[in-house]
Amino acid sequence: MYKRQIFSYDYELFFGIMSGTVQKTLIEPTNLLLDCMESVSARGNFFIDYLMFECLEKLSDERAKSDLKLMKEQVKDMVRRGHRIELHLHPHWIDAKYNGDGTWDYTDYTHYSLYSLDEDVRSRMFRDGTIYLTKLAREVDPDYTICAFRAGGWTIQPFCILKDCFKENGIVIDSSVMHGICQDNKYSKFDFRYAPNKEIYRFLDDVCVEDENGEFVEVPITVYNRNILKKTIEKVIRTFSIKKKCIADGTHQRLDLPIEPRRKKWLKSMPTAFSMSSRNPFIAALAFRASNKSLITIIDHPKDFTENALSIIKLYMKKADSITYHDIKQKL
């Protein structure tokens, strides 16, 4: 089967007890990814966490100014190298506090989800984010337009409250859904268990309900079933191979959410997103080969970068061509 793939990355800091710094969490790992993709003619799609830029724009601190400049130049470099930048929103930035040393305090997650915001606040975020990223991209490509969105924390539901935000800003593609996955905690919830198990589909008012005449398109993150056998193989491989360490200086760890017992998590067979940094290349290759999808949409984060990501990019590019969300939009 002829396959294509989408390399998608959420460009953001950590949202745990240590946010990490811009240099170690974004700039350095992203540059490694960009160089690797260029070496194999791969094209990436970077979902840019706009509110991070907005918060830095408000600070007069020299470190913050320097970090902002680095990020803006890197985003323009993405476009210059032929990659795409698209809109990503993590609304809990409105409650974040700057620590003065390049890191952030996220102890308040009240507004973690888009549905926690008033309508006018959501509309403003979409509008300002689209304008900001478009302006950055057009310093490189005068005709650039944003066409896709990914919700922070995948909280794209209920879509009916976001529909006008999409329409008003020319966004036609969403890529937040992961078939079979759900979450419900005090800050966020989503339920994709009954979403169409398809590579791409149209929808209108609900991202989990296909509508052939819908004006929006869902490009779901591809998942595969990660059972106890695959987990065991991964563990054995990790035991006898050089450990691939994350180079970033932040952490996902949070103290405000319960941690699922390790044994229960280990025994559970679960749908798992196609990713790269946290996967072993051997397991990634098996999952890619076993997938019955002709389009594989991969999600990763520069902040999670390990050398595994570089190996898997090179491996996957031997098996399939890479495309962008804009390529999909042009064929609608």
Task: For the regions a language model picked out, list residue spans one by one.
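Distinct, well-ordered alpha-helical segments
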Residues: M18, Y98-N99, C160-D164
